[in-house]
C-alpha cells in the first residue's frame, strides 16, 4: 500500500494517565483498505505547530477486532506535538494521518500455538497492547508473557485494559509489573527491568529457546540489555523484534557537516522513485536524501528523522550510502539493500533509491 497522508477527523480523546491520552480517528469507507493495519504498526501524525510542519509517529493501540483506529500519545517534556495532543486536541479536530507503517509485530495465524514474550517500558506498551489484543483473540492456542516497567503504579499506561485481558485470558496471559520508584511486596518486581529479572521470569514461562516471538519496546538502553539477555539465554536472533521509543543510553553518531555549512554545488545526485514518479534530486554536502528532497520541494516520506520509526525506508538500487544511525532496520533488510533515507548520505556521485519497492 502506498505511503500517503489523509486528513482524518478525531472522534475520541481519552485520558489514559495524567500525562498520556489515546486518540481515535474516523476512517471514511473509501479509505478503509488504506488504513487496514497489522498489530504493532504505527501512524505518523502531521500538523502545523506554531508555523512549523511537525510530524511524529505514534503506535496503534487498538486490536484487529476493536473496529477503531486509535493511537496513544505520552506527553514529553518540551515536546511540541505530544503537548498539543495532550492539552489541545479535541473530538472534531482534523489531523493529517499517514497510512499505517512499520514491520514491528506479527500477523496472527488461527492455527498457531506460539510462545510470545513482550518486554516494554513506559509508552512502549502501546504497540504491545495491539499485539496482545489481536494475538490472544486470533491465536487461541498461543500464550503471552508481558514484563512491563514503569516508575510508579499511576504511570502504568492501559492498566485497566491489561487487567481485563489478564482476566479474560486466564492461563494464557501473564503480566508482570516492574516499578522503579515504588516499592512492591515482591523484591523481584522492584527497580528497573534487568537481566536477572528477565531470566527468572522466563523460567516460569518457557525456555528462552522456545520463544517464537519476543517484542522489545521502550528506551534504547532497556532494549539493548533485554536483547542481549534473551540472546544469551538462547532465543534465536530472528525471533527478537525491537522498536525504539527513545535512544536514551544508545551511542550517538558523530555530527556530520550540515548542508548549511556546505556550498551550493551538488556533490551527488539521488535518482528517486516514489508512487511511480521519478525524481532527480541534487544533493549538497552533508545532506541526507530526506534533506535534499525537502530542499527541492519534493514530499518524501519521513517522520522521526532519528533512525527509529522506519517511515523513510527505501530500497537502494545502485550506488553507495552511509547511514549515520539505524535503530529500526533488521539485518536481513540491510542485506537486501534497504536504507533509512533520513540517515543516508551518498558515498558515490549517483545513487538510485526506490520507495515503491517494499
Question: What is each stretch, according to the model?
Answer:
Residues 4-9, 264-270:
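Short structural boundary motif marking the start of a folded domain
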Residues 64-67, 109-114, 139, 346-355:
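Ligand-binding loop in jelly-roll beta-barrel domains
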Residues 42, 68, 93-94, 288, ...:
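Residue-level marker of beta-strand positions
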Residues 2-98, 111-114, 142, 150-152, ...:
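Ferredoxin-reductase
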Residues 83-262, 269-271, 278:
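FNR/FR-type flavoprotein reductase catalytic core
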Residues 279, 292-296, 301, 311-358:
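Iron-sulfur (Fe-S) cluster-binding segments and ferredoxin-like electron-carrier domains
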Residues 265-305:
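C-terminal accessory/binding modules appended to enzymatic or scaffolding proteins
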